[in-house]
Amino acid sequence: MRTNLTFCFVYLILFNFTFYTFLNLQILYQDEHLVAINKPNGLAVHKSKLVGNTNEFALQLLRDQIRKRVYPAHRLDRKTSGVMLFTLAEKVSSMLQKQFMERNVSKNYLAIVRGYTETHEVIDYPLTNYSGKVQEAITEYSRVASSELDLPYGKHETSRYSLISLTPKTGRTHQIRKHMNHIRHPIIGDRPHGCNKQNKLFKNRWEVNTMMLHASEIEFSHPITNKKMLLKADLPNEFKRTLKILSLNFTSA
């Protein structure tokens, strides 16, 4: 247990369940209308049938922490860490959600993926949602760093990895995860969209069992003041540790 963090992670193996216990959430920004947190990996934003058995949610924890009712302004996967916006009034939440719908919000992610990616690429590949509807989906990414380890993998004598910066142009469910798997550069630790062999390698060799996808930045207009806002979330320690393991050089701005 790491007590020096803003949240506490307890990992127990009991009947094949993983239990998380979170303490105070890291607040990145707060005023009378908005509050932004650096959401830990493994914490669902709110209760839904997709998150399975869990008793803790960011919505509930933040409400109890600041003693005010909060409303999520957008989605962020349970397995993804990083910037998550909430509002303190339902009306303000609707105003922010309108910015998302009109694509006036820019979100940036960092991910560690298998292989050497292109230097820059736009992935334009439609995705099918849960109801079977095919939707436009576009993700732009750039390679930040790459490395090669003297570690045999499959038919290859070495293992290659890339750190990439991604900007989704649309907001489909699991869009980044599905797009990276589609171009054969799956995100390390991603289940079910990743590479099972790589995930097993990282778990057994380095005890890395979390998904290497982090929402690092979000840029939007304040729904009340119209001021341009840029919020950044520092990388989780596990992400930093994995960068070090793979010799991927990265310095956040």
Describe every region a protein language model picked out.
Residues 2-253:
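RNA pseudouridine synthases
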